[in-house]
């Protein structure tokens, strides 16, 4: 992972995604304006086109475990969006495909390498998980675990998939 000052200056967004069986949610915060950016694929709401246009416009992103998960899912969406749009997939069909890939990505993380190498991703990524060495077996920590250790006001697990 590259963290040169030039790359750090180009980051414009902090982001996270949530993938459920029938829902995809993308949330970002512009680091300059603090504007919240939201894209949803669920039921009657299908922001796929806008999400893809937005992802392609980014200079960089900051996240937690985003190199192994969030950016992988976003790259999968970008790689498949054209087919989904041409075949007129519903939001439910799209979220089903995203969910399957998400589960494969989670299962693959125990084995090693992600599907998309960092240099093949749609934009530069700064991964706080790797930057602070939480991927080291002696220090491995989840975002929820860090929130609890920092006495975060509200720390909850999502009880559904």
Task: Map each language-model feature to its residues.
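Conserved catalytic core of nucleotide polymerization and phosphodiester-bond processing enzymes
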Residues: 2, 15, 21, 32, ...
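N-terminal accessory regions of nucleic-acid-interacting proteins
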Residues: 1-10
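Two-metal-ion RNase H-like nuclease active-site motif
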Residues: 9-19, 127
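Short, well-ordered alpha-helix to beta-strand connector turns
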Residues: 9, 58-59, 122
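Metal-dependent phosphoesterase core characteristic of DEDDh/y 3'-5' exonuclease domains
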Residues: 24, 32-34, 67-161
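Acidic beta-strand-to-loop metal/phosphate-binding motif
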Residues: 59-67
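Nucleic-acid-processing active sites and adjacent nucleic-acid-binding tracks
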Residues: 34-53
């Amino acid at each position: 992972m590259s963290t040169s000052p030039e790359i750090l200056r180009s980051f414009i967004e902090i982001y996270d995604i949530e993938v459920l069986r029938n829902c995809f949610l993308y949330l970002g915060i512009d680091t300059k304006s603090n504007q919240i950016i939201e894209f949803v694929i669920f039921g009657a709401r299908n922001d796929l086109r806008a999400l893809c246009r937005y992802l392609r416009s980014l200079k960089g992103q900051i996240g937690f475990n985003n190199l192994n998960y969030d950016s992988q899912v976003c790259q999968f969406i970008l790689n498949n969006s054209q087919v989904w749009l041409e075949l007129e997939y519903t939001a439910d069909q799209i979220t089903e495909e995203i969910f399957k890939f998400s589960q494969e990505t989670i299962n693959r993380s125990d084995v090693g390498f992600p599907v998309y190498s960092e240099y093949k991703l749609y934009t530069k990524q700064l991964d706080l998980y790797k930057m602070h060495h939480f991927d080291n077996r002696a220090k491995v920590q989840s975002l929820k675990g860090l929130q609890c250790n920092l006495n975060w006001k509200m720390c909850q697990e999502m009880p559904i998939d």
